[in-house]
């Protein structure tokens, strides 16, 4: 690679992938760093996403094909930036890469999982099921190979290595560090759902049938823990009644003081999942205000006007668990000026977007706003943010923003 032309992109979700492809296909060298075992980010766990309401395969597979054919993008998964120093056109970067214990000889034959005696919680499905200690991160994993969670392995176990006919398992892999120079840097570090355990009154920790919105996406997905059937986590029975609790943590000075932008549309979309599976489902959506940015008026109107969808303006005070195990919601109904208490099969908390940048920044000069987002106006030249690292936005807006960010990164390279 030409040192002078390198662009570092931190984060391998849809934002980072888009930025990398746009820069590389313009002729610039890119290093793409992702801390998880696979690219794809949050979108890879969705059942469907706007604007076309298609599964992530329809967007990610095209981008993965472009990545495979590009000679200008160097991808490092299980990697984190530990240190950055320098100035625009001449940044020095230190990256730490963790071992996957499986090399690129892996052909996904699955012989290893057949003999593996250990299991681990499946973080891709938000711990709603389990995988073996050697596992494929998800059905669309890129790179497409297994990974070993050594912490889940039995001491001294080498059964997966013995079962592999392709010498793909390497239990002697070590953590490594490498350094390189980069002309410009883009943080496309994405978001995480706000920790619903902090919302003590909403029953997330006390009832298995109180879940958050990203867990709902996995329940609806054919690659999820229930193969696409929306069932109660507690007993795997079909869901007949659901409550969606909007602004679970968002627009709350004690938690996330801002609107997370996507939650209202997300809940209406998920209500539609339920109606498609069971048109007789009874759905209540508890909201403060319905905020649906973008050109989705017809979709919003169609869901809200469904006879089995009840829009209830009011805050949820608390969620308890009845003796029969079902969650019960106590809430205010502002328009009808009364308090209500109702039992549901399932409660979905529309938890807000929290920026991943809050966790760790390897460059002191980076400025975050009070909510943890990387405001573009306050950054050192040559350092940029893209997508939800900048502000809460949906997938479509993230892609548009990332395309523009690629151009900014390219301009830094050309000016230096």
Regions found by a protein language model. Give the residues of each.
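Residues forming the flavin
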Residues: 1-416
